[in-house]
A protein has these predicted regions:
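Glycine-enriched, solvent-exposed interface loops adjoining structured elements
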Residues: 1-102, 107, 113-325
Length: 325
């Protein structure tokens, strides 16, 4: 048996488009699709994928992210151009200071860096930020130009005030900061000792009914407001101590856009055919496809999409049924 021993097959944006147009008889395999038609089809493909995201897609678009808390801050805006620091958890290094910091410090020194799995790491992060809990209780975010196995170099902006030996430090790259999420699936509070506590996700009406929204303590509730440009996390009560640094969340995101011909879909490859047939269904209206063909394409497209939504996009987890008392 002559097997390939490879499992890296994928498709590009233009592969999906050309296959979809063939399904409705709009082109042959040897045809060159005009750029204007490719552009129109790419627009339909992007809107189609975004619509699917609104329906609850998808397991592979979920990530564990960390929101760094500021003492006394109630509202955190995340997304492009925002000032809150919400970062992919697997991109964060942490350590503890072995040398105290002052406002004159240009570098920080830690015993060693660890990743989120508590494994020692020494990879240079490059440009990013160091998050340092100062003696004042404020979480200070300082730009860094580079990191080593035991420290990092500030990028012209030193800490705002002192930080003692033993203070916790987190480091991460600029590119690991998240874009606007679609929804929050779960949230937990994490303290410096590694202990966690669940945070209740509440709706807007319940949040509005909370009295004294600036009450301080350990956050127990959070409202997620997705907005259009920058999403907002509203926590209650607001963090007030050096004990709680983070809220760890499972977030769901949009898949990447199809911006260029060679872009691959941010989907498992088993979704390729569903993308092709559903794009064909969308494009059949624009190409004047006859009703019979359009109906057949629609039936196949809907079937392929529903099968994957019902089977491939589900977690492997046990379901327990119990008799009501």
């Amino acid at each position: 048996v002559a097997l390939s021993a490879s499992k890296n097959f994928t498709v590009t944006r233009d592969d999906i488009i050309t296959m979809a147009l063939r399904k409705i008889g709009a082109n042959d395999a040897a045809d060159v699709i005009p750029a204007t038609e490719l552009s129109a089809a790419a627009l339909s493909l992007n809107t189609l994928v975004k619509e699917w995201t609104g329906e609850g897609l998808a397991l592979w678009l979920r990530r564990t992210c960390v929101l760094f808390l500021q003492s006394g801050q109630q509202r955190y805006k995340v997304g492009s151009g925002t000032t809150a620091f919400c970062v992919n958890q697997d991109s964060i290094y942490y350590g503890t200071l072995t040398t105290a910091l002052t406002t004159a410090s240009t570098t920080l020194v830690v015993t060693t860096w660890y990743d989120y799995q508590d494994k020692v790491v020494s990879t240079n992060l490059g440009t990013g930020y160091a998050a340092i809990r100062l003696d004042s209780g404020v979480m200070d975010f300082c730009p860094i130009t580079a990191s080593s196995a035991t420290g990092a170099t500030f990028s012209g902006t030193p800490v705002d005030s002192a930080a003692a030996i033993g203070a916790k430090v987190y480091a991460f790259t600029t590119t690991s900061m998240i874009t606007r999420p679609v929804r929050v699936l779960s949230a937990t509070r994490l303290n410096n000792n590694g202990n966690t506590a669940e945070i209740s996700l509440i709706g807007r009406a319940d949040y509005d009914l909370l009295s004294q929204k600036n009450s301080s303590g350990n956050p127990t509730q959070m409202h997620f407001d997705p907005q259009l440009d920058a999403a907002q996390f509203l926590v209650w009560p607001v963090a007030n101590s050096t004990d709680t640094n983070q809220i760890v969340m499972t977030l769901e995101f949009y898949p990447d856009d199809f911006d260029a011909a060679a872009n691959n879909p941010e989907f498992p490859i088993e979704w390729a055919n569903a993308l092709v047939w559903n794009l064909a269904m969308e494009m059949s209206f624009e190409y004047g496809t006859d009703v019979r063909t359009r109906t057949q394409v629609a039936q196949i497209a809907i079937s392929k999409k529903n099968i994957l939504f019902d089977t491939a996009d589900r977690e492997n987890a046990s379901v327990t049924f119990a008799v009501s008392q």
